[in-house]
Design a protein with these regions (language model features):
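Short, charged/polar "capping" segments at the starts of alpha-helices
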Residues: 56-63, 192
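RNA substrate-binding interface of SAM-dependent RNA methyltransferases
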Residues: 43, 103-191
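Short loop/helix-cap segments at secondary-structure boundaries that form the rim of catalytic
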Residues: 60-67, 103-106
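Short active-site oxyanion
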Residues: 26-29, 47-50, 68-69, 137-138, ...
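Glycine-/acidic-rich phosphate or pyrophosphate-binding loops and their flanking alpha/beta elements
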Residues: 94-106, 195
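Boundary-proximal intrinsically disordered activation/regulatory segments immediately upstream
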Residues: 1-59, 144-145
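Short acidic-hydrophobic, aromatic-tinged amphipathic segments that line or gate anion-handling sites
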Residues: 2-6, 72-75, 164-173
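Glycine/small-residue-rich loop that forms an oxyanion/phosphate-binding "nest" at active or ligand-binding sites
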Residues: 66-96
Length: 195
């Protein structure tokens, strides 16, 4: 375990940079905060590259740290600066962004398609609701907010790690899915019906 005592530490700067979409895209990683989210990620098949814990969390919480993941103990005030939330729980993880290239939908499964969702909290809530309702995945158009936004991940309340979420699904792809046997059912806020 390494200790971080300064916000000018390169690891601290790196973690903070991942709150920005361009850094997440550049490095292919994102952060998650909080005991539940980190525990859910550890219990999933996601690749966690590092865990950061505050001094007080390390001293007071009984948390089982995996031996195969880099662990950093961070001075409390420095940890606060690394986090996206105003009242962090004292633990965060850096997670690799999954490769989506191999996604092929299954006609035996059900998916929710989101078009142009621009609020990260709403997207996280949709992911959480889809998980609770028994859907097998969530498909996102290019017009949707960044899937790996800290607020999206946080709003999903751990469902982020239970659901298959695929980005960049165009209308053309939806048409292909329909032609291959999927039934498409749509809903919207316009108040009109359409075939």
């Amino acid at each position: 375990m390494l200790e971080i005592t300064s916000s000018s530490n390169n690891k601290c700067k790196y973690v903070k940079s991942l709150s920005q979409k361009k850094s997440r895209q550049k490095y292919g990683e994102y952060t998650i905060e909080g005991i539940k989210s980190v525990s859910d990620a550890l219990n999933s098949e996601r690749e966690i590259t590092a865990l950061y814990v505050s001094d007080s969390f390390f001293e007071n919480e009984k948390f089982k740290y995996p031996k195969d993941i880099s662990l950093y103990k961070v001075q409390d005030d420095v940890f606060m600066k690394m986090c996206d939330t105003k009242a962090p729980q004292g633990i965060l993880a850096v997670v690799k962004i999954e490769d989506e290239a191999d996604f092929t939908p299954n006609t035996e499964k059900s998916y929710i398609y989101c078009d142009c969702i621009n609020d990260p909290g709403n997207l996280g809530t949709i992911i959480r609701t889809a998980d609770a309702a028994g859907f097998d995945g969530v498909l996102l158009s290019d017009g949707c907010v960044d899937l790996y936004s800290p607020k999206t991940v946080r709003s999903s309340m751990g469902s982020f790690f239970n659901m298959r979420v695929v980005t960049g699904v165009s209308y053309e792809k939806l048409s292909e899915y329909k032609n291959s046997g999927f039934q498409l059912i749509g809903g919207g806020l316009c108040g009109n019906t359409q075939n």
